[in-house]
Amino acid sequence: MAQVKRLLINYKTLEEFKQFKEYGIQELSMLEDLESNMIENDSNSPFYGIYFGDKLVARMSLYQVDGSTTTYFNHNHDYLELWKLEVLPGYQRKGYGEALVEFAKSFGLPIRTNPRVKSAGFWDKMGFESVKYDMERDKGENPLIWEPAHIQKNTGESA
């Protein structure tokens, strides 16, 4: 299994992120996120990645959110937002994306993500479920959620 590492907020990571921008779409770019964290001198990095040798081949950002105001879940637990999961083309379908998601699940908190085009099968396989669309809350996104077994399931449907 691939080892997930917290990525340092520094110029080396900034250079590594540039290789993703070449292959990815603009909305997946994490360069701006990383640059703002560097400017703020934020040492608590939300970025995680997997290396193949010395090369960063998969990455994501993971943020813990205060659950007291969420409408995604039937509880007030804090949850994680998993953003911008991306694996370089030559390394896809080798378990790196799954390893990142399993790493996020290991925190034992519910997870919310916004899937990208053509990724529905991946998120289904990882156990994520759609929530009922809410125009004000979701603002054009189509969020998916995952909840650990010890927390009550909610698909966003009202009783």
Swiss-Prot record:
EC top class named in words: transferase
Superkingdom of the organism of origin: Bacteria
EC number(s) given by UniProt: 2.3.1.-
Ranges for domain N-acetyltransferase: 7-151
Alphabetically ordered keywords of this record: Acyltransferase, Transferase
Transferase recorded as keyword: yes
Lineage start: Bacteria, Bacillati, Bacillota, Bacilli, Bacillales
InterPro entries: Acyl_CoA_acyltransferase, GNAT_dom, YlbP
A GO molecular-function annotation: acyltransferase activity, transferring groups other than amino-acyl groups
Name assigned to this protein: Uncharacterized N-acetyltransferase BPUM_1403
CDD domains tied to this protein: NAT_SF
